[in-house]
Each structure stands twice: as structure tokens, then as C-alpha cells.
């Protein structure tokens, strides 16, 4: 509710509100309750850190489930398909800023298009300080 109040004061209007939580901070079902109470409409936490792809087996949203009440939340899960650090980072797939990395992102994006799903991409803000990474991000978004 506080987020929406501040956004209203700033003139920010949008129909969807979502977020992503670092996996080390995630706690089921407490985190889901928090998002629900905050009025979020979707969560994009679920992904693999070490491999880009379909951790949830889908690129379509689905309702978050409350295991304590055996019911669905209003909150939707929007699976995170790719994170820049996973694909280009040395600690994970290690493709760097190469044509192979761009190809991997574009393959995943096309796989989502093929089934009319959503390609959810996480690109951390510090990565925009590097011109090559900005160019790769732009190529992915424009594709």
C-alpha cells in the first residue's frame, strides 16, 4: 500500500505491479504473503542462477499457491527466463559479451514467442554502465 501511495503522489500510474526477490531472501509462503499484502500483481523470483531457461517449465504466468490455506493468491508468478549475470557472467554460463551470449538470449526469447509466452529478462542496473552490455540489452529488447 505504501508503494502505491508514493507512486500516486508522484503521478505514476500503471496497471501491473511486480517484483523479484533475491533467492537468499525468499521464504515460502511468507514472501508470497508479503507481495500479496503489498498489492503486487506478479512476482518474477523463480529462475535458475546458474542456467538460463525455464525453471518453472513455462513462460506463461500462473497463480501463486498458498500452501498453508490450499488456495491460490491473487498474485501471479511470472517466471524469470533469463538473467544477464547467468548468461554472460564468469561464475555461471560464462558466455561473456559474445555473439554466443546474444544468440542464447534470442533463442530463449523466440522460444517464448513460439508459445505466445512472456520473455522475462532481468538486467541489473550496474550492467548499464558498460557500453557493450547496453548494446546487448538493446539488441535483445528490440529483437
In which residue ranges do the predicted regions lie?
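C-terminal domain-boundary segment and adjacent tail
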Residues: 6-11, 99-143
Amino acid at each position: 500500500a505504501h508503494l502505491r501511495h508514493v507512486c500516486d503522489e508522484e503521478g505514476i500510474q500503471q496497471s501491473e505491479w511486480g517484483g523479484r526477490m533475491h533467492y537468499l531472501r525468499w521464504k515460502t509462503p511468507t514472501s508470497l504473503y508479503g507481495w500479496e499484502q503489498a498489492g503486487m500483481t506478479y512476482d518474477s523470483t523463480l529462475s535458475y542462477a546458474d542456467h538460463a531457461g525455464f525453471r518453472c517449465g513455462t513462460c506463461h504466468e500462473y497463480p501463486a499457491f498458498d500452501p498453508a490455506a490450499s488456495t491460490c493468491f491473487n498474485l501471479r508468478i511470472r517466471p524469470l527466463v533469463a538473467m544477464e549475470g547467468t548468461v554472460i557472467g564468469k561464475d555461471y554460463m560464462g558466455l561473456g559479451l559474445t555473439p554466443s551470449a546474444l544468440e542464447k538470449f534470442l533463442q530463449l526469447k523466440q522460444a517464448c514467442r513460439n508459445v505466445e509466452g512472456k520473455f522475462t529478462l532481468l538486467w541489473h542496473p550496474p550492467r548499464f554502465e558498460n557500453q557493450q552490455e547496453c548494446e546487448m540489452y538493446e539488441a535483445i529488447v528490440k529483437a
